[in-house]
Amino acid sequence: SSDLNGGEYTYSYDKAGRLKSMTSPLGYTKNFSYDKVDNVVKESDSLKSTTTYTYDKLHNMKSSTNALDGTTSFSYDKYGNLVKETDPLGRSNTYSYDLAGQMTSAADPLGKITAYTYDPAGNITEITKPGGRKTSYGYDKNYNVTSVTDPMGYVAKTVYDKDNRVTE
């Protein structure tokens, strides 16, 4: 592939077809290593930075560690939904889900909550940010987003043709 200046990226793959390395037009290289079930367990680059990853038995990432940033850890519920993410400084984001596995809330380390609401088809209909700022979404019968209302009340509308292509 090419960047915006026409520089070429090169990619190499292992025998299993997994990305082994990627090199940018400027020579920056990133290498990838995998475990026996295809999880990326290590990324290293030409700047001598290395990140390692661990996983649980369901292949959910448990931790991400590098020398510069430290370790970020992840916890999941029995359905595999991410419920807690803790950064190297011990700050945590927490997440809640409904029975359909849709995220209903996200709390930042300060306890500020963002809430999410869905229609029966699973489309997100509203995002409420801390302080009550709401963004609402409307859909047509084909589940295309037809309107977005921002916290200030501005409405952006989108119109689709019968083939679900944007016309306005």
Residue ranges and their predicted role:
Residues S2-D3, G7-S24, Y28-D45, S49-N66, ...:
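Beta-strand elements of repeat-based all-beta scaffolds
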